[in-house]
Amino acid sequence: MATIGMLYICTGKYTVFWPEFYETFSRNFLPGCKKEYFIFTDAPSIAHEDDPAVHRIAQPAYDWPLSTMKRFAIILTQQKALEQLDYLFFFNANLTCREVITPEEFLPRPQQGEQLLLVQQPGFWNKKPMFYSYDRNPRCTAYIPYNCGRA
C-alpha cells in the first residue's frame, strides 16, 4: 500500500476550507492508501487534528504573492518526514474530492514503466503553449523561449 503525503497550506481565511477538504479526500482520494496530512497553518487548532495522520505545522500567514513564492520553503521545513512517503501532492485550500479516485487510475504503474505523475493546472487546458506561464527570462535555468513549450 502506497503512503501519500497531502500538503496543504491554510493560513488566514483559508482555514475555513480545511474540514471539507479533509472529509472529501479521506473518503474519496486513493482509497486503500495510507494518507498523511501536513497542514501548514496559523490557526491555533484545526478540525480533525486528533487524527494521528493529521500533522498541524505552525506557519505564519503571508500576504500574496509571498505565500505562493515561499511555498516550497514552507514545505521543505518537513523534508525529513516527507522523504519517508511514496508520493506527495500539494493541494489548493479550496479543493474538494467529489468522486472516488482510485490508485489504479491515478498513480504511476512502475510495472508498465511509469515513474512520474503529472497533473495539469486547469487554467492551462485548451491553451496554446505560447500562453503558458513559462519563465521567459533567458538568464534563468528554467527558461523556455516563446513557441518552444509543449502542451
Regions found by a protein language model. Give the residues of each.
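Catalytic core and acceptor-binding pocket of nucleotide-sugar-dependent glycosyltransferases
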Residues: 141-151
